[in-house]
Curated annotation (Swiss-Prot):
Keywords of the record: Antibiotic resistance, Cell inner membrane, Cell membrane, Cell shape, Cell wall biogenesis/degradation, Hydrolase, Membrane, Peptidoglycan synthesis, Transmembrane, Transmembrane helix
Gene that this sequence comes from: uppP
Protein name: Undecaprenyl-diphosphatase
GO cellular component terms, A-Z: plasma membrane
PANTHER family cross-referenced by the UniProt entry: UNDECAPRENYL-DIPHOSPHATASE (PTHR30622:SF3)
Record organism: Nitrosomonas europaea (strain ATCC 19718 / CIP 103999 / KCTC 2705 / NBRC 14298)
Superkingdom of source: Bacteria
Amino acid sequence: MDWLILLKALLLGIVEGLTEFLPISSTGHLILAGDLLNFNDDKAKVFTVAIQLGAILAVCWEYRERLVNIIRNLGTRQANRFVINLFIAFLPAAILGLLFIKTIKHYLFHPMPVAIALVTGGILILWAERREHRIEAETVDDMSWKQALQVGCAQCLALIPGTSRSGATIIGGLLFGLSRKAAAEFSFFLAIPVMFAATFYDVYKHREFLYIDDLGMFATGSVAAFISALIAIRGFIRYISHHDFTLFAWYRIGFGLIVLLTAYSGLVDWSVD
């Protein structure tokens, strides 16, 4: 295994883990990072999807006690309500993804659309933060099915790379009456079925690019994603306990503008093919 490939896998794994659960778009960052590292062929695209498993497992580990309790208490009203809400929120993006993902990947999975989505998403976060929030659900257990559906519809925006799945669901949650912590935690829980389904579906469709010789590359990226995602989740929950999402909005806007400016100035040759 080429050491340069392993280094790229390590860097992309760290990028995936640090950005997956923050409202800054992991897909957008991976597309841009892959372009800079010249790691954007078909095998690389499967790799960036597969290493999401590391990030998913980080959520499962961080909330393992809660997940075990839900499984043990299936059949009770509270546990059933939580599972049903997750299923309701999962459906909109799953349906739209199956219908339009090929078209979206063909036209939008490139640096320039990502940069535009980063800036647009940042502006929307600033707008959402300036709205008055009426909290109707302090915890995920207080959520109604209607709020779950609304968050699920908001998640559909994340099909556009650069938008951010966590950003769309968290900000959507705030707009629809969830507390900051409830919005963030529901976003984390919702990531489990969404990312598992998307990862296995995409990897299965591109299984011809999977080889035993690449096991080291996939393992390196997945472990890096797991560790960095665990750090990001814990830090993010602590941060939003005392702050809003304005910092992430300005980061998105700044990063997106840098990509656009470097592209149009010719300083960086972002690929568009």
